[in-house]
Amino acid sequence: MDDWRKVLLTPKDSLERTIKVLHEGGCRIALVADEFGMLLGTVTDGDIRRALINQLTMESPVSLIMNGNPITVDDKVKNKDILSLMSDKGLLHMPIIDKDGILCGLETLQHLI
């Protein structure tokens, strides 16, 4: 994804903001990172649905619903290997991190095929 920064959130961002980012980003995932760019988690449409079912408010922080242990790949991994991993795991998105855990990209299945 060329402009992955448009789906970037902080852990304190509200569910309302998260929904807007998911909608505007158009790729059904948002990335949660700290002030240094370290990936903390991911949020998908399904996470939002579960939050609403569990009666969280729109003001609740995204940190309450994010997947804090997403599958990621190193920024040195080739696209064909990312595609293979995504296929094996049934994933539509893959956050890309550097050796220090800093977010540096997002690959989508749509972009890779």
Predicted regions and their residues:
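Tandem CBS (Cystathionine beta-synthase) repeat/Bateman regulatory domains
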Residues: 1-113
